[in-house]
Amino acid sequence: MNHMERKKEQLRVEVRRAVLQAELATESEVPSVLLEAPKDKAHGDFATNIAMQLARIAKKAPRAIAEELVANFDRKQAGIEKIEIAGPGFINFFLDNGYLRELIPQVLTEKDDYGSSDVGQGEKVLIEFVSANPTGDLHLGHARGAAVGDTIANIMDKAGYKVSREYYINDAGNQIENLAASLNARYLQVLGEDQPMPEDGYHGQDIIDIAKQLVDEAGDQYRQLDEKERLAFMRDYGLKKELEKIKQDLNAYRVEFDKWFSETSLYESGQVERGLQVLKDKNETYEKDGATWLRSTAYGDDKDRVLVKQDGTYTYLTPDISYHLDKFDRGHDRLIDVLGADHHGYIPRMRAAIQALGYDPARFNVQIIQMVSLFQGGEKVKMSKRTGKAVTLRELMEEVGVDATRYFFAMRSPDTHLDFDMDLAVSKSNENPVYYIQYAHARVCSILRQGEELGIPYSANTDLSPIASEKEYELLKAIGEFPGAVAEAATKQIPQRIANYAYDLAQALHSFYNVTRVIDTENKDLSAARLALMKATQMTIKNALALLGVEAPEKM
């Protein structure tokens, strides 16, 4: 339990004691004490609506109940400086400043672990994200999904969940046959043949580049094979090269996966047939018009879904169901799928299938990633200037950098459309949020170096009593909010909570710095206390940025 959680628990105990002492309810009647951080800091550090909850039991007006509670509340015992009653009976608590100072040794002791919690209680979570078809470069939707998925994984990991990251390789469908045919055509074209592209072929530059690479490596030796053998080779070679490229781009993007799961392996292992058999054994399928159907309407879907077509082939849903069954078979307690905006209709049918398999649908969560629009020079960027095709993740990283790309994709709710301002992302100004946060970190590091050069020591045991100004306490409150922000972001899977938190913390630091002289050579005790505060700030900013996959530079 972190510092602020301990404080909240202490407050709950004291509120409960005050309720009983004021004889407003019996032991069994006292409701759970809800404590929330008010949006307006003028309303204190924590607020409770316990007076409203007690109104029916105590048969009194909430405000009168609040007044009785405050009269019976031991502020000193709870570490509260003052209490205010607001509106119809909300009780606002303002923390004692001495208690806030205790945050500094906690952060300095926990270091990289500051912000961690056991909210997840070791729950095993599998997050599947990106999972782009290995038939071309990663585009902006994949880029946003990668940033969101990885950030959620980082946050949940810090909050005590056991997280696994997985990429599902779609290597068993028609798209792979089209990849093979496209690469075959480009290979023969590079060798000088007048070979037409297949009707559903891929026309991207990446296929041409792979064909040229193959010619450089092997010349025309594959032209000698019969077409069936050559297409089989092209399938494997093209898939290998596309995956290599995807892995390189994601590695540069600071995204790594614990497992790359092949769709083909589902067929080779018999898992697809097994998933279908499980549904049949549970009487969740039926035969009609020569096809096998899933009774998905029984679980909220708008219509039943075909699993096996009349010709005996599977629909795309069948291997997907078996894949999710496999995820549960591997011991995961919860599944999170990060999917593109075009997958809205997929959710109810997969949730229905999971229920049909016998699992609680609450164990299946979906994070939808909405579309991204790029803007540069005030105009929408529709195509890459270099290739004339859609802008890729690689190009965006080259244009604005990994840090800005990751932060911008995480700073808004994933299920809302994002306008990505490329000019803002590279600007060295306070309007650029990632620059603003990184500059705060670099500024603190500069102060710490200055203190080191002057030989002013500080540690977790430094006397912190000289810390007494309003700006110092505002900064401490911002630092203290980090564990709660991580816990909330993890339980609700809202990565933007951490992006916004990092910005708010940077804002508190800049506001403090603008009116405060950290190092005073005439007052070593004050300087040491403030340097300890700066170190706690630096560690917290760094930890927040790490969750976002963003670097924390020491110099800028």
Swiss-Prot record:
Enzyme class: ligase
InterPro entries attached to this UniProt entry: aa-tRNA-synth_I_CS, Arg-tRNA-ligase, Arg-tRNA-synth_N, Arg-tRNA-synth_N_sf, ArgRS_core, DALR_anticod-bd, Rossmann-like_a/b/a_fold, tRNAsynth_Ia_anticodon-bd
Reaction(s) the record says it catalyses: tRNA(Arg) + L-arginine + ATP = L-arginyl-tRNA(Arg) + AMP + diphosphate
GO terms under cellular component: cytoplasm
Compartment(s) where it occurs, according to its Swiss-Prot or TrEMBL record: Cytoplasm
Source organism, top-level taxon: Bacteria
Major localisation: cytoplasm
Pfam family, one: DALR_1
Signal peptide: none
EC number(s) per entry: 6.1.1.19
Disulphides: none
Similarity annotation: Belongs to the class-I aminoacyl-tRNA synthetase family.
Protein name: Arginine--tRNA ligase
Species annotation: Shouchella clausii (strain KSM-K16)
